[in-house]
């Protein structure tokens, strides 16, 4: 009996399952439920131990339906690595109960669905805009909202907590000093704004605001053919851009039902692990600099620069690379490139060890990071943490092990796990992950498979230039694919990879056309940063700055 059938039997005694629809779509288990049952179902699934993680909540708009909106919950079980998608239909002007009693991390995801679609989550304690500004009119991810519509923000907001002019709610307390940090402040590591009330150097309470770098990536995806979305993914986590390319292409390929060649898989693994290394160099280097260790910053960025040199040799670009294509890679690696990678990772291993010895035993560094702003494993799961932040809390979850892809299950590497969930453990985990990435790269580079770097499906991949200019079949193939685009079958999929900051997920809906009907990104930073006010409450201001750095927040993926 499969997982879905077991779940059906379990739910039979608790719910009227004759109103539920159980399906299996592109490898995903799906339950469609009446909106009235969704909150209770989610609470039951968590409390019964079926699904401990809420990875994503999003909306989808179907204007021709009587109930035009889907509310989609993507759940994960860390014990058996199973996933479940729960869907409920909500009509215009209707509401659905909040999922916060079941999963604390639903907070910002529901606010985003409210902001983008106007879906009302009844019982949400703070249902307001999160990505668009306070003067924005409408809901941009509705199908009737024009993608070319531009709305300028001309009035600034004062420092307050409710974030909506004229709305009731918390007000500033005269006993405490109001302090605004960001969104243009070097300590914020991006366009992040923190509004705090201070009692001396202690944070009494704070609120955080995002959206300053929002450009509606998901709306742009709906207006572009599948392959043309790839450059936009570069701008998500721009510190490890190839990982975004890989995650997006992997989701589309799964919907298409194609498997890329072994050589393309190997190249993607190498690029992903190099990207993980440079992402961690930024997190460690800038974080240490915030604590006064300036040497670390220059040391780490020296390693990063050498990796960029390899990217440049492979594709001509450094930061935003667009190296992958749906079906494989954009081009093969140049001769000798894998040998250069092997030579560089030896340097990186040596440099990582030297840097770790310089930092992790440093008395000042230990005092500033150990037992500072810790997060428990239970709280991390409730918030939806993934990646190094989750593993620092003692939870051994890594998709490369839990749901292996591209041959990770055949590679020998370890998953570093912390114990205290404090700032110190977050750095220890990232240092060790750099070493493990080096191990992975060495194994793959020494055994790169032969064969092609892409599939040769004429309905998916453009022909090579020599074929376009050399024969009529290649020319016509190129013409038809450009004009009509690749067209995945009607369906939907949620696919995820282990990016540098955690689970990078793509919920993709196809209506059979050349553009995605709906593309939702699950950015790892989003779930993490929503917990910031809780994590730093009662801490010193300097510790809050160190916490921001240890979270490695990237505004590009946070705001999209």
UniProtKB/Swiss-Prot annotation:
Q: Where in the cell is it found?
A: Cytoplasm; Cell inner membrane
**Where do the record's region annotations for NADH dehydrogenase I subunit C lie?**
2-157
Q: How does it sit in the membrane?
A: Peripheral membrane protein
Q: Does the keyword Membrane apply?
A: yes
Q: Which positions are tagged coiled coil?
A: none
Q: Cellular component GO terms, alphabetically?
A: cytoplasm; NADH dehydrogenase complex; plasma membrane
UniProt keywords, alphabetically: Cell inner membrane, Cell membrane, Cytoplasm, Membrane, Multifunctional enzyme, NAD, Quinone, Translocase, Transport, Ubiquinone
Renumbered residue ranges of the record's region NADH dehydrogenase I subunit D: 175-560
What Pfam families does the database record attribute to this sequence? Complex1_30kDa (PF00329), Complex1_49kDa (PF00346)
Per its record, what are the GO molecular function terms? Answer: NAD binding; NADH dehydrogenase (ubiquinone) activity; NADH:ubiquinone reductase (non-electrogenic) activity; quinone binding
Q: Which reaction does it catalyse?
A: a quinone + NADH + 5 H(+)(in) = a quinol + NAD(+) + 4 H(+)(out)
Q: Which PROSITE patterns match?
A: COMPLEX1_30K (PS00542)
Task: Give the matching InterPro entries.
Answer: NADH_DH_suC (IPR010218), NADH_Q_OxRdtase_suD (IPR001135), NADH_quin_OxRdtase_su_C/D-like (IPR037232), NADH_UbQ_OxRdtase_30kDa_su (IPR001268), NADH_UbQ_OxRdtase_CS (IPR020396), NDH-1_subunit_CD (IPR026662), NDH1_su_D/H (IPR022885), NiFe-Hase_large (IPR029014)
Q: Which family does it belong to?
A: In the N-terminal section; belongs to the complex I 30 kDa subunit family. In the C-terminal section; belongs to the complex I 49 kDa subunit family.
Subunit annotation = NDH-1 is composed of 13 different subunits. Subunits NuoB, CD, E, F, and G constitute the peripheral sector of the complex.
Show the HAMAP family listed in the entry.
Answer: NDH1_NuoC (MF_01357), NDH1_NuoCD_2 (MF_01397), NDH1_NuoD (MF_01358)
Annotated function: NDH-1 shuttles electrons from NADH, via FMN and iron-sulfur (Fe-S) centers, to quinones in the respiratory chain. The immediate electron acceptor for the enzyme in this species is believed to be ubiquinone. Couples the redox reaction to proton translocation (for every two electrons transferred, four hydrogen ions are translocated across the cytoplasmic membrane), and thus conserves the redox energy in a proton gradient.
Query: Which NCBIfam families does this UniProt record tie to the protein?
Result: NuoC_fam, NuoD, PRK06075.1
Its name, as the record gives it, is NADH-quinone oxidoreductase subunit C/D
Organism whose genome encodes this protein? Bdellovibrio bacteriovorus (strain ATCC 15356 / DSM 50701 / NCIMB 9529 / HD100)
């Amino acid at each position: 009996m499969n997982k879905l059938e077991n779940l059906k039997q379990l739910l039979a005694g608790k719910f009227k399952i004759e109103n539920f629809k159980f399906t299996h779509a592109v490898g995903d288990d799906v339950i469609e439920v009446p909106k009235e049952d969704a909150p209770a179902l989610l609470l039951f699934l968590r409390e019964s131990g079926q699904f401990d993680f809420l990875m994503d909540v999003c909306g989808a708009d179907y204007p021709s339906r009587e109930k035009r909106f889907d509310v989609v919950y993507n759940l994960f079980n860390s014990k058996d690595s199973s996933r479940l998608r729960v869907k409920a239909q909500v009509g215009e002007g209707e509401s659905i109960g909040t999922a916060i009693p079941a999963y604390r991390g639903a907070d910002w995801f529901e606010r985003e669905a409210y902001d983008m679609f106007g879906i009302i989550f009844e019982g949400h304690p703070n249902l307001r805009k999160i990505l668009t500004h306070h003067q924005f009119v409408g809901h941009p991810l509705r199908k009737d909202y024009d993608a070319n519509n531009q709305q300028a923000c001309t009035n600034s907001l004062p420092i307050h907590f409710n974030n909506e002019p004229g709305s009731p709610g918390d007000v500033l307390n005269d006993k405490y000093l109001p302090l605004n940090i960001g969104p243009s402040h070097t300590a914020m590591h991006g366009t992040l704004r923190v509004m705090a009330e201070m009692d001396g150097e202690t944070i009494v309470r704070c609120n955080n605001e995002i959206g300053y770098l929002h450009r509606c990536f998901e709306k742009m995806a709906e207006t572009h053919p599948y392959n043309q979305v790839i450059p936009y993914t570069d701008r998500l986590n721009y510190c490890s851009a190839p990982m975004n390319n890989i995650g997006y292409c992997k989701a589309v390929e799964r919907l298409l039902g194609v498997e890329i060649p072994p050589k393309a898989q190997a190249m993607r693994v190498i690029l992903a692990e190099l990207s993980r290394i440079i992402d961690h160099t930024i997190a460690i280097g800038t974080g240490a600099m915030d604590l006064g260790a300036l040497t670390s910053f220059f040391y780490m960025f020296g390693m990063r620069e050498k990796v960029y040199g390899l990217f440049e040799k492979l594709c001509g670009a450094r930061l935003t690379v667009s190296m992958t294509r749906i079906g494989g890679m954009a081009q093969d690696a140049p001769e000798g490139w894998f040998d250069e990678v092997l030579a560089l990772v030896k340097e990186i291993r040596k440099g990582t060890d030297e840097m770790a010895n310089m930092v992790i035993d440093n008395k000042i560094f230990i005092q500033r990071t150990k037992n500072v702003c810790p997060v428990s494993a239970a709280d991390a799961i409730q918030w939806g943490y993934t990646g190094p932040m989750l593993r620092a809390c003692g939870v051994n979850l890594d998709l490369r092990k839990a749901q292996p892809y591209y041959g990770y299950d055949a590679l020998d590497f370890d998953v570093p796990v912390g114990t205290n969930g404090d700032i110190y453990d977050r750095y220890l985990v990232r240092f060790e992950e750099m070493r493990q990435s080096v191990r992975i790269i060495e194994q793959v580079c020494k055994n790169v498979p032969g064969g092609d770097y892409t599939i040769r499906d004429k309905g998916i991949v453009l022909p090579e230039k020599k074929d376009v200019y050399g024969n009529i079949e290649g020319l016509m193939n190129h013409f038809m694919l450009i004009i009509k685009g690749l067209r995945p079958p009607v369906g939907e999929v949620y696919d995820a990879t282990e990016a540098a900051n955690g689970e990078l997920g793509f919920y993709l809906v196809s209506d059979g056309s050349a553009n995605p009907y709906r593309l939702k990104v699950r950015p790892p930073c989003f779930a993490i940063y929503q917990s910031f006010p809780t994590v730093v409450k009662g801490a010193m201001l300097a510790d809050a700055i160190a916490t921001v750095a240890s979270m490695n927040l990237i505004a590009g993926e946070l705001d999209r």
